[in-house]
């Protein structure tokens, strides 16, 4: 029996693994940070033997509420992931599983590899409407890439989407994959109509270093990128610095920042009600977008979410609030669950890579219905 995490986005520390019924593990902290919650490891096992794996530091993780009613994910082939029995006692997260094959992977959520990220970018650039632009490099020397889809034009809107500021929120890049696939589908009428009205700038992975390192929330310098937007720097947060500069160059008429939430088992949005310039026009745009999304898909709801900011009290270090204030535009954080959508549960897979991708496709429809209202 062996346990390994020496691969892209791997994260686990083996404390004890002498017998299948008493495997003791710990999640490693993000580098230069106290955050931890993402895990991803491989178990070479005793087939048809019950394995009991206890992550003993789960109770000290970044979001302890994220373990309540949570079920870990497993896969034999790294393509098809399914939920497995998992319990949390306030301190320990215990995964109990009897494998049918010699090797099995476990993860906090379905991983989105750096290799797949490269495939997404380079397959997209083959489309005549798409350009792959490299804005610069991360601290570890990885490209900060943006896909430009469509062309600027008179009265055309500029729409930005970013994902994986927090690298452990892999559902965000699955969302982007679905969004991009649909936007580039020449047979899709919604996509074609949108590209007549808007140009898109899409960043599928804002934090490639943290993704490869197996971090939950930080980049290679230990920075939480979604707290860097007010004063980014090339030394600490080049990812935000480069993307923000590009936004200042292009302008922004709409921005969606795609995330995952550890605790809440729902899809929801967080808006800009606390920014200094928030007004009736901005509020009307936000309400319109939510109403459209509610009409499009039962995967979205607006009853559960974050507490709204008081007037003038928004944290402008966040991407969505900084963009909303800087460009006076519709700017939302979209959150998806690590657990399941409790309003439409799937006990086999929970919220999943495929459901994230389909939700991304649905959001394209919502943008189509609101694009004419943006300015």
Each model region followed by its residue ranges:
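Extreme N-terminal flexible tails
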Residues: 1-100, 104
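A short, polar/proline- and glycine-enriched secondary-structure boundary/capping micro-motif
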Residues: 62-69, 116-119, 156
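Active-site/substrate-binding loop(s) of hydrolase catalytic cores
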Residues: 131-149, 154-316, 320-324, 331-335, ...
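His/Asp/Glu-rich mid-to-C-terminal helical/loop segments that flank catalytic regions of hydrolases
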Residues: 343-375
């Amino acid at each position: 029996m062996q346990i390994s995490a020496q691969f892209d986005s791997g994260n686990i520390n083996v404390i004890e693994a002498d017998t299948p019924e008493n495997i003791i593990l710990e999640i490693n902290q993000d580098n230069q940070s106290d955050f931890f919650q993402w895990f991803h490891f491989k178990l070479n096992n005793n087939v048809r033997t019950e394995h009991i794996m206890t992550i003993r530091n789960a109770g000290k993780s970044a979001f302890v509420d994220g373990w309540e009613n949570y079920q870990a994910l497993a896969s034999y082939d790294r393509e098809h992931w399914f939920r497995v029995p998992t319990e949390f006692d306030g301190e320990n997260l215990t995964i109990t599983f009897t494998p049918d094959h010699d090797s099995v992977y476990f993860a906090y959520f379905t991983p989105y590899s750096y290799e797949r990220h490269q495939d997404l970018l380079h397959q997209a650039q083959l489309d005549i409407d798409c350009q792959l632009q490299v804005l610069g490099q991360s601290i570890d020397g990885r490209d900060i890439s943006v896909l430009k889809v469509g062309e600027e034009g008179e009265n055309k809107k500029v729409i930005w989407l970013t994902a994986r500021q927090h690298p452990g929120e892999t559902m965000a890049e699955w969302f982007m994959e679905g969004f991009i696939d649909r936007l580039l589908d020449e047979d899709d009428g919604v996509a074609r109509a949108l590209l007549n009205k808007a140009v898109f700038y899409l960043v599928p992975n804002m934090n490639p270093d943290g993704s490869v390192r197996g971090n939950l929330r930080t980049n290679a310098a230990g920075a939480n990128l979604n707290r860097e937007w007010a004063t980014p720097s090339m030394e600490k947060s080049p990812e935000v610095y480069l993307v923000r500069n590009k936004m200042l160059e292009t302008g922004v008429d709409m921005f969606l920042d795609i995330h995952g939430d550890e605790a809440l088992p729902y899809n929801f949005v967080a808006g800009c009600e606390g920014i200094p310039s928030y007004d009736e026009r901005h509020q009307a745009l936000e309400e319109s977008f939510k109403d459209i999304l509610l009409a499009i898909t039962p995967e979205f709801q607006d009853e559960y979410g974050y507490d709204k900011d008081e007037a003038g009290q928004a944290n402008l270090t966040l991407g969505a609030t900084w963009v909303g204030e800087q460009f006076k535009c519709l700017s939302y954080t979209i959150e998806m669950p690590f657990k399941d959508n409790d309003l439409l549960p799937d006990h086999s897979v929970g919220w999943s890579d495929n459901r994230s991708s389909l939700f991304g496709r649905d959001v394209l429809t919502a943008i189509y219905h609101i694009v004419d209202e943006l300015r």
